[in-house]
Each structure stands twice: as C-alpha cells, then as structure tokens.
Amino acid sequence: EKTIADAERCMRELPDDTVAAEYLTPFSSGGVSFDVMANPKLLEEAYNLDTTLIRDLVVQLQLEYDYLIIDTTSTFSALNLSLMDLSTVIDFIGIVDFIPTIKNMKRGSDALKELGYDDNKIRYVLNRSNARTRINVKDVEAILGHQFHYVIPNDFQTAAESIKTGVPLVLSAKDTPLAKGIRTMVDTYEEDTASPQKSQEGGWLSRLFS
C-alpha cells in the first residue's frame, strides 16, 4: 500500500515525473467508489512531510477530482495552514465534553480569526453532541462567538465499528442518527459547490451520502 510519504518522497526525487493519483488506494462498496491517500506508516515520516511538496501533490489532485477531503491534525502547523489556504471549506470540529477541550476550541477559533480566514469558509461542527455532559452548548457558542453550523450525534459504537471494518458508516449504518447527521452536513456542501448539471447527474459524493 502506497502512502502520502511515498508520494512526497517521489515528488522530492522526481518532481517532474510524480503523478499524485498513482499513490491513491481505490475503495469500492455498495456502488460507491472513491480513492484514498493513506497516512504515513511511520511516525517520523508524518513529522517530516515537506509542506511545499504536499501542497504540490494536493494541487495535482484538485485538478483530477471534483472533491478532496483532507483530514488534518488539530494543530496550526505550516502544513495545515497551507492546506487550509487551498481549501474551499474548513470544518472546525470540536467536542464539548470537558473544560480543556472548550479552551482549545476557543484558541483555535481565535487563531482562525487572527489568520484572516473568511467566516464563510469556516464551518463550526459539534461532534458527539449528545455525549453525557453538563456543559450547555449555548454557553460554548457564546464563548466561541459562533453558532455551530452542524451538530453530529454521539454514537461511539457505530463509529468504532466503521473504523474496525474500514467501511464508511454512511454506507454500513446509513439509517443511524450519526450517518444522517453527516449526510445532512455534506448535502449543504454539494448545494454550495455543485453546478446544476452536476447536481442532476449525481456524482460519487451524492451516492455515498444518499
């Protein structure tokens, strides 16, 4: 299995001959197909990824695909900032299970403002919203200065099973509140970015979240 570290290594050694799509792993289930670029296998590889080279790989893929979904770490590293600059939408995901996580969310929200990102580019997402906690969501929104655009229900068992099997839960557990919450969120992205013609035809994203 090829990883993003392998793609970055090739980009460094053979910049003119590197094809990012060759480092993707195809996935197909239930009539839905998409491609994934796997994480580095080694921790040191993850820490040593070159920002410029990764950015070049992403730009290549942007020319090949209608949608790219990038799962970043929860830090404002040079790499993550570069990827956010390339993004159409930034999902700022948080959990309000205890005070330290709320403080981290506040710091992250403030950092996004200081970095000058347009509010229309950022979507605030509350994850595991019905987890047992005495913290009032409205209080958290007041602290952040933003309402949550999307609320994703808490369903640890369904999420864990999806991770274990490697099958997206929107396919394997499509009738659960968790899957429905994710589909609702993604539907708004399609409405914002898809042209009328593409919306009528329906792409893999539509099939995945339908």
What are these regions (language model features)?
Residues S33-N80:
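Phosphate-binding/switch loop-helix module in NTP-utilizing enzymes
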Residues E1-V36, Y150:
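Phosphate-binding loop that captures ATP/GTP phosphates
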Residues I95-D97, I122-R134, V151-T158:
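G-domain G4 guanine-recognition motif of GTPases
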Residues I102-K121:
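Conserved C-terminal guanine-recognition region of P-loop GTPase G domains, centered on the G4
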Residues K164-S210:
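NTP-binding/hydrolysis catalytic cores, primarily Walker-type P-loop NTPases
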Residues R128, E141-L169, I182:
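Beta-strand-loop-alpha "switch" segments that mediate conformational coupling across diverse proteins
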Residues Q60-L63, S77-F98:
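Inter-motif core of Ras-like GTPase G domains
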